[in-house]
């Protein structure tokens, strides 16, 4: 099951509406309660871009390091095949690049995405799990 940036960024954003859900899900991953969880390295890029755009360079280093060290979370690198699939998803379903990278990564694995983003429901073959109920 892929988790994407909507479960990573709330740890960084103060007062984010998904803060408690994010903490619970990431805690379950760390403690081994949720298994088989992975994320695309594109999620780390999103975190870096979000912090960079706010002038938070040191925080970007700290955040990426913390996520990199999160136990029981596998990081899946972008490959040329995943990038090609993402480009097709962008064209066919009108989603943004990062969502397309996440979708393509999930489709290359088990086709399951845990997210609150409704965009994934437009992509055939994906199963979307709501983190509020996992």
Q: Residue locations for each model-derived region?
A:
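Acidic catalytic patch
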Residues: 14, 38-43, 71-91
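A generic structural signal for short hydrophobic patches within well-formed alpha-helices
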Residues: 8, 44, 120-121
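Conserved glycosyltransferase catalytic-site signature
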Residues: 5, 41, 80, 98-100
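Short, well-structured N-terminal submotif of metal-dependent ribonuclease cores
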Residues: 1-39, 52-62, 133-134
């Amino acid at each position: 099951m892929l988790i994407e940036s909507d479960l990573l960024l709330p740890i960084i954003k103060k007062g984010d509406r998904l803060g408690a859900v994010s903490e619970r899900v990431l805690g379950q991953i760390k403690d081994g309660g949720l298994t088989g969880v992975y994320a695309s390295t594109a999620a780390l890029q999103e975190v870096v871009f979000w912090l960079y755009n706010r002038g938070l360079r040191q925080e970007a280093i700290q955040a990426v390091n913390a996520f990199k060290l999160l136990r029981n979370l596998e990081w899946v690198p972008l490959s040329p095949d995943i990038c090609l699939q993402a480009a097709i998803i962008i064209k066919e379903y009108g989603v943004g690049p990062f969502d397309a990278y996440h979708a393509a990564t999930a489709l290359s694995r088990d086709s399951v995405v845990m997210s609150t983003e409704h965009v994934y429901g437009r992509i055939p073959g994906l199963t979307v799990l709501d983190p509020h109920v996992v």
